[in-house]
Structures are given as C-alpha cells and as structure tokens.
Amino acid sequence: MNIVLAASEAFPFCKTGGLADVTGSLAKELSKHKGNRVILFLPHYRNINRVASLKVVPGTFLIPIGDRLETASLSYISWGNVLVFFINNTKYFDRPELYRTAAGDYFDNDERFIFFNRAVLESCKFIGYRPDIIHAHDWQAGLLPAYLKTVYKTDAFFTRTRSLFTIHNMAYQGQYPYSTFIKTGFHTVDYVPERFEYYGGISYLKSGIVYADYVNTVSPNYAKEITLDEKMGFGMEGLLRSRQDTFCGILNGLDTGVWDPEHDPLIPYSYESFSPVKGKAACKQFLQNMLGLEVSPSKPLVGIVSRMDYQKGLDLIPGVVNKYKDKVQFVVVGTGDSGMEKAFMALAKNNVGKVAYVAKVDEELAHRVYAGSDIFLMPSRFEPCGLSQMISMRYGTVPIVSRVGGLLDTVKGYDGITKYATGFFILEFSETGIERSLDYALKYYQDKRCWGMLIKNGMEKDFSWTKSAQEYQDLYKKIISK
C-alpha cells in the first residue's frame, strides 16, 4: 500500500506539541507493515532537526496562490523505512518558529498552508509516487482532501487515491476570511455552507471534515464528546454527526523507544517496572538538585509538563500551588499564554525551594520531570487524547487527570478498592475539585503498598503504537476498498 502522511510537524524533525509525536511515531510504525511504502511530507522549516544529511531532488515546480505562482522544491531523507520529504520555500518556511512568534501567529499562515497542501499533491506527481491513501493531519493539512475532491478530481494521477483526515484538536480550526478562499483556487460554486463557507470565511478544519473519504479523531471518548457536546465540538458537532458512518476515534500510542525508563539516555538513572523505587528516588533527588528544590525524599513532588493554555486548565493551578506549597513540591515546565507564564514565574520566585518553573520547551527536562516526579497533574478542560498521562504512567509517575477525552480512555481511576487503577480523576473541574483530588491522592501516597500498586499498574500498561497502527492500517484498507 502506498501511504502518504502530511502534517505540519513530526518528531524528531520539528515539534511544538503532541501532533509531532503522533505523526512521527505513526509513520514509523506503519512502515513496519509488510507491503507498505510510507512517505511523510513536512514543510522545510529553518530549524529542521537533521537526523541525517538531506538529499536534494533536482528541479522545481510551481504552486498557484491566488493569481500568482510560488516555487517549490524538495529535499528528503531516509528515516528507517520511511521517506521524509521536506517541501522547500524560503518565503514561507525560513522563519524562526513554525507558526508564530511571541507577538502572535504569522500573518500569512493561510497562504503558507495553502502552499503546503497543494505542494504535497504536486510533489507526489513530481516524484512519480501514486498514493493509495493520503492521511492528512489537523487543520494545517485540512485542504488536502478538499483539493483531491475538487481541483484534482479529474487528474488521472490521483484516480485511485483516497483520503483520511485526522482531527487532533477541534479548538484549532484554521479560520480565515473570504479573501483566503479566493487564494485557494477552489471554485466559487462550492462556496456554500454545505462545503467551504464558514461564517463568511473558510475553515481548513471544516474543509477536511467535509471532503475526506473518512474522518477520525485521536481517542474514542473524544469522538463521542465532539459529536454530542457543543462546547467540545466548537460549533462543528452537527457536521460531525452528519458523518457518523464515516467517523471514528482511534487512540494515539506512544513511541516506547523514546519513552522508556529502562533505556532512556536523557534521565540520570534507569529503572524497570518490577523494581522502580530506587531509580525513581534517584531521579527525584537529581531533579530537586537541578531545579533548586529542597532535597526531600518524603515530600511529594508534583510535575506538570504542558503548553500554557486555557485548554490545559493551568489558570487554576497557581491557587492550588499556594495552598499546598508547604507540604508538596511543584515543578512546572512549558510556555504559552504570557499571563500564565508570569503567574508561574512569580510563584517560583516567591517560593524558592518549593516551586520551580522553567519557561521553555525542553525535551531533556521533560523526560527528567516525568521520571523524577511522584504525581503528574493534568487538569485539562478538554483533551483529545493526551500523551503526557501515558508517559507519566510509563515512568511510574501517578497521574491526576480530568475525566475528559483520551484521559478517560487511558487512565483507570482509583476508588480505594480496584486493583487495576493507574491514577486519580478530578471529578469537579474547579480549583476546589483539583484540591479534593490532590488530597485524595496524597492520602494514598502515604500508603506505600497502594502507591506501589498504582505505579506498577501504570508502568505495565501497553501504550505502544502496535495496536493503534493496526487500526489505522485496517481503516486504510476499508477506505480504499470503497
């Protein structure tokens, strides 16, 4: 099967969030299936992590943007069994960051991803690769299914090509004004509410949902939420319900080669699920020393690795920290909303030895927080899948999470009885609700037998991509057969 994955980011090449982890890991896992040929398309950003020397594809080709033409070229590497093609255009992609600066989103993100979407299809023709399935990820690739069904509908090269569109987060919809629609090259006859029109403009996310042969999202529970709850569906719940026969949820997996406490080169001490106590204690002490926290083996250490965003519920955490800082240590890592960043900076400054905040995206530090923390706090308002709770369990760090989206699919909440629990649920989304759940967890933290059970259960759960990749493989075959 000839498979194309198209995304705006993929680990280890370029990353701002969980989308990158998913696309990179999925491509790698799919390439292990017999008979699959997998190509991953990415924009060629300035700061691409070159895991190997890039090879240049000779020649260039043109991409229409409105009434003008922009030039594209290709570079590629072989990454295991995956061919990774980078779409080059210095005007659009030679920038310090992927999507935005501290001042806001790049003003021409609409054009950047029109260019990327059309360039993926033109790249396939340029290198002579006829895909059976094009798997487009999130709004940045949402125009791909639409181009296949409209502009490229009569193109013989794509006669047998089908599309799958994966929604990673309904909150990010790629909304732009009508002037952007004109730049796309779609026909104005299709500018109606049933197709492209969206509140007088265009949504790249909606375009993917409308035109893809099949649509999925990244956990079964989130698939239910975004069709039934207008707060979760962000205005598109009706559209998703109309696709109920061609819509499903497939749980994301983890790259267990990257996230492996037994062989992780980024943590100071390794450990296994059957004997994690000494290794975790050593990682905790290392983290406390590293971040200037009081070195205390007995004091619970709560870790947070997250984007500073309203979705993540971190606006409620400073109040919680102020109440618990004398009996619990906190480590927070992440960037985003400037108001939240300032709040955590102030907390750390005023509570030296008790609270640490690191305002950057740091892969090495993230690994050390997952390994060195006792508890991982994830109070999301909504969470399509979430990888952090899976990583924390794999590292023997007990999660406290909201009962939403993929968190409900992956964490088994402890009720004081069940022997299969892996963490705790926040039953009421509020500062008080978080505090109640933290109190409940701290009660069992003192019970070493019970806490050891939670650690062991979490570390032994299988979060690998094997099962999820097989579900995608089966879905591809189903789509192609229609």
Swiss-Prot record:
InterPro entries reported for this sequence: Glyco_trans_1, GS/SS, Starch_synth_cat_dom
Catalytically driven reaction(s): [(1->4)-alpha-D-glucosyl](n) + ADP-alpha-D-glucose = [(1->4)-alpha-D-glucosyl](n+1) + ADP + H(+)
Any Pfam family from its record, for instance, is Glyco_transf_5
Listed under GO biological process in this entry are: glycogen biosynthetic process
- List positions binding ADP-alpha-D-glucose: K15
Enzyme class name: transferase
One GO molecular function term of this record is: alpha-1,4-glucan glucosyltransferase (ADP-glucose donor) activity
Q: What is its EC number?
A: 2.4.1.21
* Pathway(s) this gene product operates in, as recorded in its UniProt entry: Glycan biosynthesis; glycogen biosynthesis
**What's in the keyword line of the UniProt record?**
Glycogen biosynthesis, Glycosyltransferase, Transferase
Q: Does the keyword Glycosyltransferase apply?
A: yes
What's this protein's family per the entry? Belongs to the glycosyltransferase 1 family. Bacterial/plant glycogen synthase subfamily.
Sum up the protein's function in the record's words. Synthesizes alpha-1,4-glucan chains using ADP-glucose.
Under which name does UniProt file this protein? Glycogen synthase
**Species, as recorded:** Elusimicrobium minutum (strain Pei191)
